[in-house]
């Protein structure tokens, strides 16, 4: 089971990945995190009651890592706290992600869900984010069990 600890200006967001349901998307996020890609980036698009989006190196929603990854649509719904891959059309994701504030069933089957907040405190932090809040660091934790 793979996890991420996102340290933000507003607090800590603990995420548990859906390793089996979106293995390539998880591996991409893990690699970018381990390379320090997300460190210092902002949540550039926050819509209260909907979601917080980050992962754009330009801070505008127009950037990515320089490559695209295929969608891995799965049966995990977009619930409060769901981590999902942002994209500009099918198979155009890369580094941008969003975390839902509330259930968003209209996104099911459209975006790759690849994780979930681990606890209520993490979801509170997600909901407290505002445009421009920074990701300070992302630590990946792998449990070999």
From Swiss-Prot:
Does the record bear Membrane in its keywords? Answer: no
Give the first-level EC class, as a single word. Answer: isomerase
State the SUPFAM superfamilies in the record.
Cyclophilin-like (SSF50891)
Q: Which Gene3D superfamilies does this chain map to?
A: Cyclophilin-like
Tell me which UniProt keywords the record has, alphabetically. Answer: Isomerase, Rotamase
The PPIase cyclophilin-type domain, residue ranges? 1-145
Q: Name one GO biological process term.
A: protein folding
Q: Tell me which EC number(s) this protein carries.
A: 5.2.1.8
Chemical reaction(s) catalysed: [protein]-peptidylproline (omega=180) = [protein]-peptidylproline (omega=0)
Superkingdom assignment = Bacteria
One of the entry's Gene Ontology molecular-function terms is: peptidyl-prolyl cis-trans isomerase activity
What is this protein's function?
Answer: PPIases accelerate the folding of proteins. It catalyzes the cis-trans isomerization of proline imidic peptide bonds in oligopeptides.
Tell me which family the UniProt entry assigns to this protein.
Answer: Belongs to the cyclophilin-type PPIase family.
**Entry protein name:** Peptidyl-prolyl cis-trans isomerase
Please tell me the species this chain comes from.
Answer: Synechococcus elongatus (strain ATCC 33912 / PCC 7942 / FACHB-805) (Anacystis nidulans R2)
Q: Which gene encodes it?
A: rot
